[in-house]
Structures are given as C-alpha cells and as structure tokens.
A protein has these predicted regions:
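Short aromatic loop motif centered on NTY/YTY
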Residues: 169-172, 194-235, 239
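Sec/Tat signal peptide C-region and signal peptidase I cleavage site
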Residues: 20-26
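Extended amphipathic alpha-helical interaction segments
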Residues: 136-176, 192-202
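Short, surface-exposed basic-aromatic patches at helix termini and helix-loop junctions that form
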Residues: 89-90, 178-191, 211-213, 225
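N-terminal secretory signal peptides that target proteins for export/translocation
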Residues: 1-6
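Short, thiol/selenol-centered motifs that function as redox-active sites or metal-ligating centers
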Residues: 101-113, 119-120, 157-182
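Non-globular targeting/processing and membrane-anchoring segments
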Residues: 27-153, 231-403
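Bacterial N-terminal signal peptides
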Residues: 8-19
Length: 403
C-alpha cells in the first residue's frame, strides 16, 4: 500500500513538473508575430522573451512615436483609402500584384484588403530579423531607431525615399525589407503565423535547393486578419527590367495566380520606358483592375476597347525629378475626374494627387465586372496654374525601391 501511494505521489509530481515546464519552454521562443509587434511598437505576448524589453525607455519612446505616426496616417489616408476601395471596387480578385512596391504592404492592404494572396516585388533583398531578445545592450534601441528612420518618408508622404532607407536598413542588426513588412502587418491588425524563405526557378516553380543564378529569392509570410481568413504575402527580390524578367521565372510564377488586381504607385515612371515593356504587358494582360497614379502605365498602352477608366483627383503632371513624363491624354481624361479626399504618390497633397482606376471589360466588351464607380460629369474648367514642386527630403530622390 505504501509503495502504491508513493508511486501515485511521484506520478502526480512528475505530471505537475511537466505541466509547469512546457509553458516555460514555449515562452523561451520568440514568435515572428511577437517580433513584428515589438518592432511596430505594440506589446508582444505577456510570456514572450521580448516582454521585459518593453520596459526599456527606448522601446517606450518608439511605441509612442509609432502610435502617433500611424494614428495620423490612418486618419489622413488609410481609412479614406479603404472607404474609397469599398465604394469603387465591386468584386476584388483573390490575387493582388504590386510591382515596384518595396515592402509597402500598408497601401496594398488599404486598397485591396479583401485579397488573399499578395505578390510584392522590387530589387531590395528580403533581409532578416535577428532574435531581438539576444541583442547586446543598446542594440535594441539602435534597431528601433533604424526602423523609424526607414519609415519616415512613407509615414509623412506615401512612398519610400529608397536611398535613405537602404542605408538605414543595413546599418544595424536588422536588414532588408522583412522588418518593414513585419511593422506594416502588425500595424494593419494582422497576426503572423509563419515566415518562410522561398525561391523561384526559371520556370516559376518554388524551390529550396540547387538555386541557380537566375533563381529569384524572396519570402512567404502566412498571416490572418480579424476575419480569421488565412492569407499569404510573397515578397520577391527581382529585377523587373526586360532582361531581368526574361532571365527569371518571376512572371511565370505570377501567371499561376492570375487574373488578379494590380497597384502601381510612385514607380519612378519606369513603365513609361522601353526597358520595362515585358512587365507592363504582363500587368495589362493579367489584371482585372489596375489602380495607379500617373507614374504607372501610360494611357497610350491601354486598349481603349478593353478598358474603362475612372479618374479621381487632379492631374498636375510629374514632379521636377521626372521631366518629360507629362501626358496630354492623362490631362484630357482627368477633366472629368471625380473628387478624392486623400493624397497619394509623389504629389502627396490631396489637392494635387491623381488616381486612376482602370477596369478591364469582359471579353464580349459588355458591362463592367469589377468596379461600381459611376462616371462623373466633367467639372467646370478651373484657372490653370503651375503645379507646386514637392519639397525634397534629405537623403535621396524618389526612385523605385531598390533602384
């Protein structure tokens, strides 16, 4: 009897020790979602190894800064963009393409929040985020400061100043686009479930070994929004010029997800040039809708019989950094533009911004499948005035991310 009682006591003690030890071991691991929240100035899980670091004055200052900056951005732009999208997009497709995007998930989500697969692409490599809990003293504050600096332009305007960001994101313990994607996902209310490095072979197939010179490297992020729907974000580091895309399988991979919707914003007018015709043709052929500012696809390349146009805002021409990109056809189209209450692109002030919603018609040319925006009567012509140039930021020009 005594031996049986002792065995039971020993069994209960072991079970209790196991129950206590398991959460402890789990808590030793920093999850990607906690890392994203920490970088975004949001509290991680209570049992996260990062939780004690939130008592650091550097993190608390960082959190206050991002709370204010993202709060202002939400009120000034993001909430208005989501309302615009709800009003003007009738049936968004599951796939969303964002070429020349950099890590700009923020506006991809604002315009196409109902997408389930996002494909972002630019030259900058995905980079990495080290275990922040293991950084040396002072390392966390430096990492957070670099993130703040790299986001300063997009939080103030709606685009990255890439030269500045490239320096900031290679100056410390974090690098590339991944930390910025983390911040934007967390601040957009997403929960990250997993992050996996990926690569594409020349046929557009996802591979993990025997990577050749033409392999396109990237990252796949699995996440969910408040609706609980599992979503996928791909970011690929790739050259989108004609030689670049012809030598890689990136567009072949994108074609497996077609048709989708496309966003083109602050794209350095690269799609105006003859060196980006392949990606331009792909976007036109594989998009049901295209949302763009005037730095996207010139109007002349749209088949007028296949597309219907809904202009918003005011076309004031390109900023001084991009001379020779003025479009007479754009100016003519925007004479019937509807008003817009938010700014976007290089001309980020709301009274100077332009946005074009291009909707592809069904093959028979009847109806409008993916938009509900009504045509507006032409406004009364106003007195012409010379567009005011944008004030340059210190640290670089307004080029496509990674250029």
């Amino acid at each position: 009897m005594k031996m049986r009682l002792a065995f039971r006591v020993l069994t209960l003690a072991f079970a209790f020790a196991l129950a206590v030890a398991q959460p402890s071991r789990a808590a030793d691991t920093v999850t990607v979602d906690d890392t994203a929240r920490f970088l975004a100035g949001m509290p991680p899980s209570a049992d996260s190894p990062l939780a004690p670091l939130t008592k650091d004055p550097a993190w608390q200052r960082h959190a206050r800064f991002f709370d204010q900056a993202f709060g202002q951005l939400e009120q000034r732009q993001l909430a208005k963009i989501r309302a615009w999208s709800d009003t003007n997009l009738a049936a968004p497709r599951p796939t969303m393409y964002y070429m020349f995007s950099g890590p700009d998930f923020l506006y991809a989500d604002a315009f196409y929040g109902k997408a389930t697969t996002y494909v972002l692409s630019a030259l900058e490599p995905p980079g990495s985020v080290l275990d922040l809990a293991r950084l040396p003293r002072g390392g966390v504050g430096a990492a957070l400061y670099n993130v703040e600096r790299s986001l300063s332009s997009i939080l103030s305007f709606s685009f990255f100043i890439t030269k500045q960001m490239r320096v900031d994101l290679h100056a410390g313990q974090i690098s590339g686009t991944l930390p910025i994607l983390y911040v934007f996902l967390a601040r957009s209310g997403k929960t990250i479930h997993g992050v996996t490095p990926v690569a594409l072979d020349e046929n557009g197939l996802v591979i993990s070994e025997n990577l050749g010179k033409s392999a396109v490297r990237g990252v796949r992020i699995m996440f969910a929004a408040n609706d609980g729907v599992e979503r996928t974000l791909y970011y690929f580091s790739t050259d989108l010029s004609n030689p670049g895309v012809k030598a890689s399988g990136f567009l072949k991979f994108c074609a497996t997800l077609a048709p989708g919707n496309s966003l083109l914003k602050s794209a350095s007018y690269l799609l105006h040039s003859g060196n980006f015709t392949t990606v331009r043709d792909f976007i036109l052929a594989n998009s049901a809708t295209i949302i763009q500012d005037d730095s996207g696809i010139p109007l002349v390349y749209y088949n007028q019989k296949r597309w219907r146009f809904f202009p918003f805002g005011r076309y004031a021409g390109p900023i001084a950094e991009f001379p020779g990109r003025y479009q007479e056809s754009y100016a003519e189209l925007f004479r019937r533009a509807q008003p817009m209450d938010f700014g976007i692109g290089y001309r980020w002030r709301s009274h100077e911004s332009n946005l074009l919603l291009a909707v592809k018609l069904p093959d028979d040319g009847s109806g409008v499948a993916d938009a509900v925006a009504p045509d507006a009567p032409p406004p009364k012509p106003g007195r012409p005035r010379v567009p005011r140039p944008i004030e340059p930021q210190r640290g670089g020009l307004f080029f496509w991310f990674g250029r």
